[in-house]
């Protein structure tokens, strides 16, 4: 059992027969009354997200999640296909369950598949990935690193803010936890 006050982003727990992943969690102490935990959660099985509050002392059954190394194969319609790199088993995951993760991976990228028992529930991507800029505004002569930056569209469709000197065709290192530019590759 885990208390609501100990839940953090990325953790998974069971509540009312549902498997829930924490997207955001924060403590709030109103002027009057008791502390509450505000959370943005996702039902792992349906993909629906919702906001809720809990008392910090509420307890939940923490879900035991196992991971296996895998490779992203391709996406077709509403399904993403992955292959276990040890057993060569293939897994189909609804795109709605891995929508954010697909912004950071290309076909044949290495990932980790998350299992709850024998059920595939999600994908973990590396902390940083290298992606190519497909579209951005032209560089401005004399632009410096301290500028405010400009938006750049990457090969997966992800849009990140980059320094002014970045041009289309360059490979960038992207932080997957925050969705931000780190450096040129």
UniProtKB/Swiss-Prot annotation:
HAMAP family per the UniProt record, alphabetical: EF_P
This protein's record includes keyword Cytoplasm: yes
One BP annotation, GO: peptide biosynthetic process
NCBIfam families assigned to the protein according to its UniProt record, in alphabetical order: efp, PRK00529.1
Organism encoding this protein: Streptococcus uberis (strain ATCC BAA-854 / 0140J)
PROSITE patterns xrefs: EFP (PS01275)
Protein family per UniProt: Belongs to the elongation factor P family.
GO cellular component: cytoplasm
Name listed for the protein in its UniProt record: Elongation factor P
Metabolic or biological pathway: Protein biosynthesis; polypeptide chain elongation
Role played: Involved in peptide bond synthesis. Stimulates efficient translation and peptide-bond synthesis on native or reconstituted 70S ribosomes in vitro. Probably functions indirectly by altering the affinity of the ribosome for aminoacyl-tRNA, thus increasing their reactivity as acceptors for peptidyl transferase.
Locations listed in the record: Cytoplasm
InterPro entries, A to Z: Elong-fact-P_C, NA-bd_OB-fold, Rib_uL2_dom2, Transl_elong_fac_P/YeiP, Transl_elong_KOW-like, Transl_elong_P/YeiP_cen, Transl_elong_P/YeiP_CS, Transl_elongation_fac_P
Keyword tags: Cytoplasm, Elongation factor, Protein biosynthesis
């Amino acid at each position: 059992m885990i208390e609501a006050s100990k839940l953090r982003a990325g953790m998974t727990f069971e509540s009312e027969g549902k498997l829930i992943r924490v997207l955001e969690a924060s403590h709030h102490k109103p002027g009057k009354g008791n502390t509450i935990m505000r959370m943005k959660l996702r039902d792992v099985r349906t993909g629906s997200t919702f906001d809720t509050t809990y008392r910090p002392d509420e307890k939940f059954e923490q879900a035991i999640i196992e991971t296996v190394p895998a490779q992203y194969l391709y996406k077709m319609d509403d399904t993403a296909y992955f292959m276990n790199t040890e057993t060569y088993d293939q897994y189909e995951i609804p795109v709605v369950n891995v929508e954010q993760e697909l912004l950071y991976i290309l076909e044949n990228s290495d990932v980790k598949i998350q299992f709850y028992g024998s059920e595939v529930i999600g994908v973990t991507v590396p902390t940083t990935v290298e992606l190519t800029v497909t579209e951005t505004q032209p560089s401005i002569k004399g632009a410096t690193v301290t500028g405010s930056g400009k938006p750049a569209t990457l090969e997966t469709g992800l849009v990140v803010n980059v320094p002014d000197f970045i041009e289309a065709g360059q490979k960038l290192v992207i932080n997957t936890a925050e969705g931000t530019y780190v450096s040129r590759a």
